């Protein structure tokens, strides 16, 4: 998990990383957390959920 301040500074690099590795990156915010993943991986998850 990386802090939101680091994610802001490295956003393009993180976008490139999740697209290349297909591994999501957890981001720690102030009180809330989030996950960054590629659009292709998100679409795949949505398709899987639809089929269930």
Mark where each language-model region is:
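Extended, alpha-helix-rich binding/interface surfaces that flank or overlap catalytic cores
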Residues: 1
């Amino acid at each position: 998990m990386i802090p939101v301040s680091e994610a802001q500074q490295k956003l393009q690099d993180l976008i490139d990383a999740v697209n290349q590795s297909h591994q999501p990156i957890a981001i720690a915010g102030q009180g809330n957390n989030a996950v960054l993943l590629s659009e292709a991986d998100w679409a795949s998850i949505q398709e899987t959920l639809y089929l269930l």
